[in-house]
Amino acid sequence: MTMTLHTKASGMALLHQIQGNELETLNLPQFKIPLERPLGEVYVESSKPPVYDYPEGAAYDFNAAAAASASVYGQSGLAYGPGSEAAAFGANGLGGFPPLNSVSPSQLMLLHPPPQLSPYLHPPGQQVPYYLENEPSGYSVCEAGPQAFYRPNADNRRQGGRERLASSGDKGSMAMESAKETRYCAVCNDYASGYHYGVWSCEGCKAFFKRSIQGHNDYMCPATNQCTIDKNRRKSCQACRLRKCYEVGMMKGGIRKDRRGGRMLKHKRQRDDGEGRNEAGPSGDRRPANFWPSPLLIKHTKKISPVLSLTAEQMISALLDAEPPVLYSEYDATRPFNEASMMGLLTNLADRELVHMINWAKRVPGFVDLSLHDQVHLLECAWLEILMIGLVWRSMEHPGKLLFAPNLLLDRNQGKCVEGMVEIFDMLLATSSRLRMMNLQGEEFVCLKSIILLNSGVYTFLSSTLKSLEEKDHIHRVLDKMTDTLIHLMAKAGLTLQQHRRLAQLLLILSHIRHMSNKGMEHLYSMKCKNVVPLYDLLLEMLDAHRLHAPANHGGAPMEETNQSQLATTGSTSPHSMQTYYITGEAEGFPNTI
């Protein structure tokens, strides 16, 4: 039976009593939660008729008291859930109400569907956690403690927040889309058309790299192999453009494993189940997690050079084509030899040969792939060895004589006019005789000369004040390629014991050439100190550079002081220095490219 409460005062008294019992229960230590922030007034949505069914069947309409102010919670209308469970409590509670400490803590509540944060019923001064209702539609059934309240103007605040989030989300999505669409070529910095050969690149660089790896790519830089490659100057130097393609990571097999065709940025990509899920990259497109190598792996990745893919026959052909032209000396048969005239002829010829040597070195396969520092370093260490092996090679057909030029053929007796020259002449003649006995071939000679160039500065003296080679690993790989080419030449006659011995003997000759070079440096430096003949700019700079690489000064003076005095008065400021020749590529009638 339902009994209606006739007076407003009695209903309010019952409500106050309920609230008092409720607060006593919540004052227990286990219910005390630290206050995080103050809580404003709360209201119940007015569209729901709040009715509570009492155990005796009485009901009280709280809408009648909506105009009255509540003493504790302000304006309020409480919506207590269905009272079917209340009948089980009997009449132990006040006025037929069951005590709140005897009610099941998991009563069911009907919550309004829109998303909002709702506080639990709490005593004044106590802040309780919030929970979020975010069901898409309809009423949701949640288990909770006391009934949920709604904050005033919550709908307006939520709507404003949604609008702000939507506007910021639109801006963020536009920026993200712009970042995803704008990519630049890693080679020339033009707009990238896609992911080609392992990097983002434009159509021009993609097509250039494709032509280079499929066809003939023996490009030569006319300058220093450090040309600027950008959108406007990418066609100015093919050698530097291809070098930059390799530097940024382009490779023949560098294709995206998750490619599906079409615009790649518009497709979702998935990996195999055994490899896990994709990770989102910084631009928003999804990539395999292990597709990009780490910076450490990139740093230690082997440098890729086209020379490593050449066959032995291609290597030999390139070395033969790179040979410098034959130079003539300024010898005048009407003038007798003396120390000054002979040294003048030899130093003038050596200075001109150095210019052609620079162009020859730039055409040696793999040499231009090195940094400019390493190229200059190797030439400074090997220039006299290269001149000497060329001299003994030309002199093989002239026993007992040295063919410096087609019009300058000298024997041992003529070398006596220069102090200290006979010893060097004897070593050169002995080496030429040894090569003649071994019947050295032209292909073998060009391989040996290239090995001298690449092997000269690999083992730098620890006491040297100059910076060591930057790309030793790459130099060793190219050096191995040269050695393999020499072995290939030997194998043409059969891999017999005699051929193995011949290979060892040829390589041993290189140590004798190194010894002759050191002797020649000492003699040339003594001639310079005695002012027998003025040295030319490039030759003088190469002489000083070689002494900088030496471990100690044979004269007993500190090496560092000697070097500083030399550099203060020699080719470091000369307009015809090594760097000048290397940059301009000056050579008399000698082409820079194959």
UniProtKB/Swiss-Prot annotation:
Processing and modification events after translation: Ubiquitinated; regulated by LATS1 via DCAF1 it leads to ESR1 proteasomal degradation. Deubiquitinated by OTUB1. Ubiquitinated by STUB1/CHIP; in the CA1 hippocampal region following loss of endogenous circulating estradiol (17-beta-estradiol/E2). Ubiquitinated by UBR5, leading to its degradation: UBR5 specifically recognizes and binds ligand-bound ESR1 when it is not associated with coactivators (NCOAs). In presence of NCOAs, the UBR5-degron is not accessible, preventing its ubiquitination and degradation.
Superkingdom of origin organism: Eukaryota
Chain intervals for the UniProt region annotation (Interaction with DDX5): 35-174
DNA-binding region: 185-250
Lipid moiety-binding region (S-palmitoyl cysteine): C447
SMART domains membership: HOLI, ZnF_C4
Interaction with AKAP13 as annotated region, ranges: 262-594
Residues the record lists as binding 17beta-estradiol: E353, R394, H523
Biological processes, Gene Ontology terms: cellular response to estradiol stimulus; cellular response to estrogen stimulus; estrogen receptor signaling pathway; negative regulation of canonical NF-kappaB signal transduction; negative regulation of DNA-binding transcription factor activity; negative regulation of smooth muscle cell apoptotic process; nuclear receptor-mediated steroid hormone signaling pathway; phospholipase C-activating G protein-coupled receptor signaling pathway
Keywords, in A-Z order: Activator, Cell membrane, Cytoplasm, DNA-binding, Glycoprotein, Golgi apparatus, Lipid-binding, Lipoprotein, Membrane, Metal-binding, Methylation, Nucleus, Palmitate, Phosphoprotein, Receptor, Steroid-binding, Transcription, Transcription regulation, Ubl conjugation, Zinc, Zinc-finger
Region (Hinge): 251-310
Keyword hit for Zinc-finger: yes
Zinc finger residue extent: NR C4-type: 185-205, 221-245
Predominant subcellular localization, coarse grouping: nucleus
Record PTM Asymmetric dimethylarginine, positions in chain: R260
Name of the protein in its database record: Estrogen receptor
